[in-house]
């Protein structure tokens, strides 16, 4: 799709496990308060592309995104992807008393400032796997770090590293 897209009702997609790729070029996906979801066993990668400029390259609109990334194929494990060549119009804010982002998989927003306010959970039909790559993040209200042990089953192979014994977290 080229340009801004505004939803006028709830949308449910059914795809193969290898998933579908929804590309929005030089525009935003305005959920307009509605829900974009996939059925169980379906996979979706939402990709924002185009040229930097006066465009918003992100989901907006206060609705709900409820989908899992594909579990196989080229976009395996990738749920939301912003083209890394985009450097403007990439910031994202999601808020709500219930999760507005119910996403399973990798959310890749390499140049985004992300603000989340009570807005994230796993997909209704997905595994426990939510991984974000972003420039910086602000979490308002209650924030929680969830165990990501479901990432391999969700099609996302996480990198591993060995930690020497005696390591600790410091403030």
Model-derived features: where do they sit?
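Long, polar low-complexity repeats
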Residues: 1-147
């Amino acid at each position: 799709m080229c340009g801004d897209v505004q939803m006028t009702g709830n949308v449910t997609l059914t795809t193969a496990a290898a998933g579908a790729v929804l590309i929005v070029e030089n525009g935003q996906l305005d959920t307009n308060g509605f829900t974009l979801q996939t059925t169980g066993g379906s996979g979706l990668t939402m990709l924002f592309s185009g040229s930097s400029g006066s465009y918003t390259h992100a989901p907006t609109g206060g609705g709900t995104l409820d989908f899992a990334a594909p579990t196989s194929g080229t976009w395996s494990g990738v749920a939301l992807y912003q083209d890394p060549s985009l450097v403007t119009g990439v910031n994202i804010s999601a808020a709500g008393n219930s999760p507005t982002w119910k996403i399973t998989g990798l959310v890749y927003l390499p140049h985004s400032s992300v603000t989340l306010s009570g807005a994230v959970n796993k997909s209704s039909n997905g595994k426990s796997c939510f991984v974000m790559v972003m420039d910086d993040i602000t979490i308002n209200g209650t924030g929680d770090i969830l165990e990501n042990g479901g990432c391999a089953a969700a099609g996302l192979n996480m990198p591993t590293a060995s930690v020497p014994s005696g390591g600790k977290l410091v403030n």
